[in-house]
Amino acid sequence: NFSVNTTHTIAFDTEMYDQNGDFASNTFTAPVTGKYHLTANMGWLNVDADSTYFYVELTTSNRNYLTIQDPRGFDQDPTYWHQNINAIADMDANDTAIIRIRIQGGSAQADLEGNEAYTYFSGCLLA
């Protein structure tokens, strides 16, 4: 379970493929300068509907991208809930990208589904 009111960097423990060795645990490193499509999905389990918000932040060397959702609209704690974030990021060679999450308020009961079908990160050079 994640502690509340704390920002956590997410470590992804399974790689489907890594063409160039550009991803390690929680950090994607751009191998060359270009535009990258970056995406992440968080598959939440046991969300506390009394939490103020859940956010997912995609942090690159040049910019932060953020999505925030408020679970207080649920009439009960959802067992499953998904958040995703996508960005086309301008990255220089050796710039990095990481995913951070924060649960504000409520109880420390939420966790992430460990299956890579539900919780994942992807980075791809576009141009």
Show the residue positions of the predicted features.
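Extracellular jelly-roll beta-sandwich "head" domains, especially the C-terminal globular C1q domain
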Residues: 1-127
